[in-house]
């Protein structure tokens, strides 16, 4: 039903709309500069055969043009060869601790740690802060001392507290 309606609207008064479009004024050529116009008139008055040559059709050239078939392909752009620059910081690769992460993470660059390692170092620092100082952690995991201090200060692991049952007071029913 929808196609039938759109076809009716599309074909409504087609002849009149086509006639109006054809009868519209076509855009004219931009006006030439007065000096150019005078030079063209002067040149055409000196050589009148140029106007004939321009307006004449050359059948030989037209037949050659009909025989031309262009088959083009874009050229493959040549990639610029970049000089291999040495890496600024050598990477140290470690495998993460634990079996659950060995499938996802293949290597860890120097200066980075995994979540498991972060939790391990936080737990070690929490259990014995005098042995696991920020300097020792930074040296052990190849981290910046400032980052380790921020990690120890702002990152807190979960703590589960179980409230003993004797502290609870029973609610007596009325």
UniProtKB/Swiss-Prot annotation:
Disulfide bonds: none annotated. GO terms for biological process: defense response to virus; mitochondrial respiratory chain complex I assembly; NADH dehydrogenase complex assembly; negative regulation of apoptotic process; positive regulation of cell population proliferation. The modification Phosphoserine is found at residue 35. Residues 15-24 have a biased composition (Basic and acidic residues). Pfam families: UPF0240. InterPro entries: NDUFAF4. Keywords: Calmodulin-binding, Lipoprotein, Membrane, Mitochondrion, Myristate, Phosphoprotein. The keyword DNA-binding does not apply. One of its GO terms (molecular function) is calmodulin binding. It is found in: Mitochondrion; Membrane. Its main location: mitochondrion. Induction: Expression is low in quiescent cells and is induced in exponentially proliferating cultures. Expression is also induced when prolactin is added to stationary cells. Induced by dietary differentiating agents such as butyrate, vitamin D3, and retinoic acid. A lipid is attached at residue 2 (N-myristoyl glycine). Residues 15-38 are annotated as: Disordered. GO terms for cellular component: mitochondrial membrane; mitochondrion. Phosphorylated on serine. Prolactin stimulate serine phosphorylation. It is a lipid-anchor. May be involved in cell proliferation and survival of hormone-dependent tumor cells. Involved in the assembly of mitochondrial NADH:ubiquinone oxidoreductase complex (complex I). Binds calmodulin. Interacts with NDUFAF3. This is NADH dehydrogenase [ubiquinone] 1 alpha subcomplex assembly factor 4.
